[in-house]
Amino acid sequence: MAIVKCKPTSAGRRFVVKVVNQELHKGAPYAPLLEKKSKSGGRNNNGRITTRHIGGGHKQHYRLVDFRRNDKDGIPATVERVEYDPNRTAHIALLKYADGERRYIIAPKGVVAGDQLVAGNMAPIKPGNSLQLRNIPVGSTVHGIELKPGKGAQIARSAGASAQLIAREGAYVTLRLRSGEMRKVLAECRATLGEVSNSEHSLRSLGKAGAKRWRGVRPTVRGVAMNPVDHPHGGGEGRTSGGRHPVSPWGFPTKGAKTRANKRTDNMIVRRRK
């Protein structure tokens, strides 16, 4: 994998920094694991915008990724190829199991075509294998972590993400997340060893606004540039600073204000994120 800075042959190329991976599959994705993906433009069933800055972009197919891997315990799989996925920052790996079935998984870092992977509590400790947290050694790096047994991976799924298993006590293990948060998770939940691939994703630069539009991201307008009817920071004669602490268009504090309200799982958090 290489970081390539483009020559400034035009204004749109001047600031482009690309991540080039020669090992990625260059052909079409595996068709039986594709699904139609329709665009909402950020609107709900009433036609009202519920998520801003969404619209347009290139057509995409959704890749069906296996986040559970619990029905293939003990069945070895061979990595056929590692692919680009437009729906996520991580790469995905196409596995061919010994029973002939193919499935996509989130590609772990260092896993290449030809590698052998297996899921199950008797699986060896190597990147890409999926086990219950109770069977993973303390100090190991993991990703694709379940919060409820059998529900599928929910934590550490994006490019370069991982968590460290730092303690095991009774029915729970303690994980240190990349955010600095330490939380308890049931030891019977599954996780995949290693960290997620494409850790260089954060080093890329799209270089121009149009590249964002290709990805379906619309512009973000500053509140101080709006009218008073549109935003609490709007209005004023000439350029103004907003006149109050930064808030969202609906008046909620932004820029670092705590928004977590889920008291039901507070006892699972040993230490808050930084």
Swiss-Prot record:
InterPro entries: NA-bd_OB-fold, Rib_uL2_dom2, Ribosomal_uL2, Ribosomal_uL2_bac/org-type, Ribosomal_uL2_C, Ribosomal_uL2_CS, Ribosomal_uL2_dom3, Ribosomal_uL2_RNA-bd_dom. One of its GO terms (cellular component) is large ribosomal subunit. Residues 34-54, 224-261 are annotated as: Disordered. Transmembrane segments: none annotated. One of its GO terms (molecular function) is structural constituent of ribosome. PROSITE patterns: RIBOSOMAL_L2. The keyword Ion transport does not apply. It holds the Pfam family Ribosomal_L2_C. GO terms for biological process: cytoplasmic translation. Keywords: Ribonucleoprotein, Ribosomal protein, RNA-binding, rRNA-binding. The keyword Protease does not apply. Part of the 50S ribosomal subunit. Forms a bridge to the 30S subunit in the 70S ribosome. Belongs to the universal ribosomal protein uL2 family. One of the primary rRNA binding proteins. Required for association of the 30S and 50S subunits to form the 70S ribosome, for tRNA binding and peptide bond formation. It has been suggested to have peptidyltransferase activity; this is somewhat controversial. Makes several contacts with the 16S rRNA in the 70S ribosome. This is Large ribosomal subunit protein uL2.
